[in-house]
Amino acid sequence: MLPDRVLEILNEMKAERIRGATWLARKGAEAFLALAEELDEALLEDAIRELRSRIIEVNPSMASLYNLARFMPITNNRELVKMRALEFLRRMDEAKRELASIGAQLIDDGDVIITHSFSSSVLEIFKVAKDRRKSFKVIITESSPDYEGLHLANELENLGIEFEVITDSQMGLFCRKATISMVGADMVTRDGFVVNKAGTYLLALACHESDVPFYVAAETYKFHPTVKSNEVVLHERDFSRSGFRVRNVLFDLTPWKFIRGIITELGIVIPPRDIQ
C-alpha cells in the first residue's frame, strides 16, 4: 500500500486537465521522493514496483511518465531513490533551458506563430525569444473543451507578448496569417509520429496546405523508446453538451511527414530519420 502523500500526488496527476507531460513528470518525480521519505526501507522495493506501474497508468499517452518510471531503480535504498528522482528533475530543467534556447533561434522579428493547446516547452521558447528582444505575435487556439489555450494566453499577457485567441474551427483560416507553427508533444513515437492534444493533427494539415513550417517542441524524455504509432492508445474522456454525449478523444497522432523538425535539447531532429 502506498503512503497517503503518494496517493494524493497520484490523484492530483489524474485530475489535472491543463498542464501536460512536463508537469506530470515533475509530479511523478515528487511522488518517488515522497515514497522514499515516508516508507520504511523494508517495504520500499515492492512500493517502487507499484508506483512505477501506477505512474505510467496515469496517462499511457505520455512518454515522460514511462521514461521516469524506467529511470527509477527498484531498490530498498531510500537515498538512492531520492538521488535518482532529483537527478531526473535536474535533467528536466537542463533540457528545457537548452530546448528553449534552440527553439528561440527559429523565431525572427515580425514572425506570427500559431500554436495549439498549452505547452510549457513552447512557452519557454517564447520567453527566451522575448528576452532576446525579438518582436513576434502568437495566434492561440482556445483548445476546447478544456481551453488550455486560455492558460497560455494568461501567461503571454503577463509576459507582455502580443497574442490573439481564436476558436479551434478557425485554425485553417488563421494559419494563412502565420509564418511558423510551434506545438508541444506528450509523446514522440518510435517511428516519428507526435501524440499531442487533439487538434494538433488538424493544425499540421493546415500548415502543410499553407506552406507554414510546423515544429514540435519535445525534450528527449518525451520520446518513447519502444511504442510505434499503431500501438498508441488514444484515450477518451466523458463529455456532454445540452444533454448530448460529445465524443472527446484527448489526443491525436500527427504523422512525421507534416513535421519540419522536432526541437529538442540536443538540437532539431528530423523524423523519422534522426529518431533512434
UniProtKB/Swiss-Prot annotation:
Signal peptide: none annotated. NCBIfam families: PRK08335.1. GO terms for molecular function: guanyl-nucleotide exchange factor activity; translation initiation factor activity. It comes from the Archaea. Complex of two different subunits. This is Putative translation initiation factor eIF-2B subunit 2-like. Keywords: Initiation factor, Protein biosynthesis. It comes from Pyrococcus abyssi (strain GE5 / Orsay). Catalyzes the exchange of initiation factor 2-bound GDP for GTP. Belongs to the eIF-2B alpha/beta/delta subunits family. SUPFAM superfamilies: NagB/RpiA/CoA transferase-like (SSF100950). InterPro entries: eIF2B_alpha/beta/delta (IPR051501), IF-2B-related (IPR000649), IF_2B-like_C (IPR042529), M1Pi_N (IPR027363), NagB/RpiA_transferase-like (IPR037171). Transmembrane segments: none annotated.
